[in-house]
Amino acid sequence: MDRTEQKSIIEGLLFVSGDEGIYPEQIAKVLEIEGNEVIDILEEMQKECEGAHRGLQIVQYAKVYRFATKKEHASYYQKLIDIPTAASLSQAALETLAIVAYRQPITRTEMEEIRGVKTDKALQTLVSHLLIKEMGRAEGPGRPILYGTTKEFLDTFGLKTLDDLPPLSEENEQMNEADLFFGSLQEISK
């Protein structure tokens, strides 16, 4: 295998290792070459990435190498972050997410009782966006899945913990409980 192919493979390894990065020893095992040679290749690649024609750089932190964007392009990355995405959540998904956030762990049936409508699609969307996940199973008939929020939920909404959620006013909480009660009452009377 020539140097160009080694660099190409290392580039891919850096990419798939993501923010965690990769140790030179791991690269050496994958490529079946000596660790010193890996270091030499990484240093060459770092120099190649230093040019103005490259958007990425290879950085080393605590013996781990990873890709990073260049600081001089930060204003462009910020513009991308500021552009609203087409993948924003629907009103139904936001309502379901709020219910999960405040009432977790919670089953799909409990969510549907609160909302008064099916939540299947909203749940699928929230799981696919990694905002909620299965937290286990409830005791009882059928052992339904319990849902809760994820670390990504906290990151997305700029929260450190669930305690940072805005408090529900007592009026809203009583209204939700009243809605739940009347919704259940209507089901029984049918």
From Swiss-Prot:
Compartment list: Cytoplasm
The keyword Cell cycle appears for this protein: yes
A Gene Ontology term for the protein's cellular component: cytoplasm
GO BP, sorted A to Z: cell division; chromosome separation; DNA replication
Lineage top rank: taxon: Bacteria
Pfam families reported for this sequence: SMC_ScpB
Keyword annotations: Cell cycle, Cell division, Chromosome partition, Cytoplasm
Family matches, as NCBIfam families: SMC-Scp complex subunit ScpB (TIGR00281)
Subunit structure comment from the entry: Homodimer. Homodimerization may be required to stabilize the binding of ScpA to the Smc head domains. Component of a cohesin-like complex composed of ScpA, ScpB and the Smc homodimer, in which ScpA and ScpB bind to the head domain of Smc. The presence of the three proteins is required for the association of the complex with DNA.
Family: Belongs to the ScpB family.
Job description of the protein: Participates in chromosomal partition during cell division. May act via the formation of a condensin-like complex containing Smc and ScpA that pull DNA away from mid-cell into both cell halves.
Record-given protein name: Segregation and condensation protein B
Source species: Bacillus cereus (strain ZK / E33L)
Lineage: Bacteria, Bacillati, Bacillota, Bacilli, Bacillales
